[in-house]
Amino acid sequence: VMNWFRLPEAERPRFVTLYFEFVDTAGHQTGTNSEKLKQELQLADELLGQIMQGVENLDLPITTIITADHGMIDMTSEKGKIIITESLENKLKGKADMINNGMHCQVYLKNKNQKEEVYQEIKQYFAGNSHVKVYKKEETPEKWHYRNHENIGDILIITDAPYYMVKSEKDFLANRKGIWGTHGYDPHTTPEMMAIFYAF
């Protein structure tokens, strides 16, 4: 990065980005209060300090922005917080494909004319579980700005934190031990999803 900034003005990039992936990786693996994450945060801080000192020494009119793409929340494999979707997926086979990432699940209809039928089936499956919400794409909360893109599922299944959807509890628990971290919940209801934004 410093070498780019030292280039002649005509060759110097006008916009440069960096991403420290090791902070996110540690948070996912061991949670937000782990010693591993603290060590990675310290490393990120040291690297950022080197960059900031280098920018200061260059004496160029450079604006620095420090941000994150999301926050993170601690999770456990506590019984009752894991929601199994295998029987729902089997029930919808032939009607829809389900792409599940834990916090939310995208349902893509094979026949758009079956939207209401499939929507009602999903609503019925989660009836009585107040921690799961089911939306038609066009009825998602406006504040999400998540209605118009063609890649968004026809129906969305959303969980409250710290509830988590998995196809098979056995397969999921085999890969999850102790505390781990995740993100993807609604930041309006889960403040841990908020990120930083500093500019100077």
Regions found by a protein language model. Give the residues of each.
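Active-site neighborhoods of enzymes that stabilize oxyanions during catalysis
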Residues: 96-200
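Acidic/histidine-rich catalytic neighborhood
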Residues: 61-64, 70-110
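Short, solvent-exposed loop/turn and secondary-structure capping segments
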Residues: 28-31, 76-79, 168-170
